[in-house]
Amino acid sequence: MSWDSYIDNLIAQTKDASGTGHSDKACIIGIDGGAPWTTAGHANALKLEGQEGPNIARCFKSKDFTPFMSSGIVADGTKYQFLREEDGKLVLAKKKGQGALTLQSSKTAIVIGHAPEGGQQGNTNKGVAVIAEYLESLGM
């Protein structure tokens, strides 16, 4: 099964009333080990390199976000500053000049959306939540 259509759906969910999208990249990884569900070949894929996926998955699986707090979150080769965590399922991060990340887990996956610099992270939060909650509703 290809999960790439979920990237398109997430990005579409971030559009505001004027039709402007507020997420430019996204991906889905497994919560067990951080293996990618979406392909890096998608035009809007957020590409996780090396240990980035496993490091993110380890924090969500254990619900221990201390590594994010002390060292930031690295995704697509960029280190983002941890902003906050909510309910052990949602993490927000930002890097000046690079945009922001929204990460939300379901039972078996972590959905990650990127808001470009100048984009509204709140809209990206909404898009990520739609996909994560849909997966959760399927027991995933």
Swiss-Prot record:
Gene3D superfamilies, sorted: Dynein light chain 2a, cytoplasmic (3.30.450.30)
Cellular component, GO annotation: cell cortex; cytoskeleton
Location (main, coarse): cytoplasm
Compartments, record wording: Cytoplasm, Cytoskeleton
SMART domains: PROF (SM00392)
An example Gene Ontology molecular-function term: actin monomer binding
PANTHER family, per the entry: PROFILIN
Subunit note: Occurs in many kinds of cells as a complex with monomeric actin in a 1:1 ratio.
Descriptive protein name: Profilin
Organism annotation: Heliocidaris crassispina (Sea urchin)
